[in-house]
């Protein structure tokens, strides 16, 4: 069977990978931050081994702090008529122009650190929590072409699958009840997995109830964190 979670939660085994993917793509339009006008990026996406390709693309993109949206056609107008110049049409990046945060991981949470420039004072850093739901939304919108470029397989390894939305539950024969005194005749008690599943179901019910009743933000967040904890320790 399975448990449908009220809110997505991070998978403790994949949270580092999710963090890296979030450093590669724009948090607003889900485009890869680098494009083919960058020779480093071109070299990176021409790597045959997908794992290595992911690593190289990540190294190029993690330095970028803006999703570029300028049109490159205008820049090359003067060079068009230079003798012997080949007319190469560069496709614009077509991003959204938003600034990109630095992604930080703290245990089972991801945080986005933005640099905010205020009119009077120096730059200051603002940290926003990236909920699993937000991350899931960003990862879900990545295009097939971008997935191929960053070395993920869209049939078998879509990035949004690294975030748990539905939790598989093993059937009872896999988690039989255990004898308390070791003789097999005395008191019988539920298996650890069954207890943990009970915790997850209760935490999930609390989150559902908080959403249904429109509870205050901080209460709903506490319940979500509890659900995240129980799923991670399952």
Question: Could you describe each region identified by the protein language model?
Answer:
Residues 1-234:
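Conserved core architecture of multi-subunit DNA-directed RNA polymerases
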């Amino acid at each position: 069977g399975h448990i449908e979670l009220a809110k997505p939660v991070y998978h403790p085994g994949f949270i580092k990978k999710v963090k890296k993917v979030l450093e590669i793509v724009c948090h607003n339009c889900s485009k890869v931050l680098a494009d083919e006008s960058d020779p480093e990026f071109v070299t990176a996406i021409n790597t045959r081994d997908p794992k290595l390709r992911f690593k190289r693309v990540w190294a190029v993109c993690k330095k970028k702090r803006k999703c570029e949206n300028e049109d490159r056609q205008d820049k090359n107008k003067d060079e068009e008529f230079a003798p012997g110049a080949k007319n190469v049409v560069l496709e614009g990046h077509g991003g959204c122009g938003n600034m990109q945060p630095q992604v930080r991981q703290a245990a089972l949470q991801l945080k986005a650190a933005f640099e905010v420039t205020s009119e009077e004072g120096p730059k200051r850093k603002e940290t926003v929590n990236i909920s699993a739901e937000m991350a899931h939304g960003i990862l879900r919108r990545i295009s097939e072409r971008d997935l191929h470029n960053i070395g993920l397989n869209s049939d078998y390894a879509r990035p949004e699958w690294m975030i748990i939305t539905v939790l598989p539950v093993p059937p009872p024969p896999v988690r039989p009840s255990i004898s308390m005194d070791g003789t097999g005749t005395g008191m019988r008690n539920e298996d650890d997995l069954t207890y943990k599943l009970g915790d997850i179901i209760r935490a999930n019910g609390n989150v559902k109830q908080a959403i249904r009743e429109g509870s205050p933000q901080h209460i709903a967040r506490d319940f979500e964190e509890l659900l995240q904890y129980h799923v991670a320790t399952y």
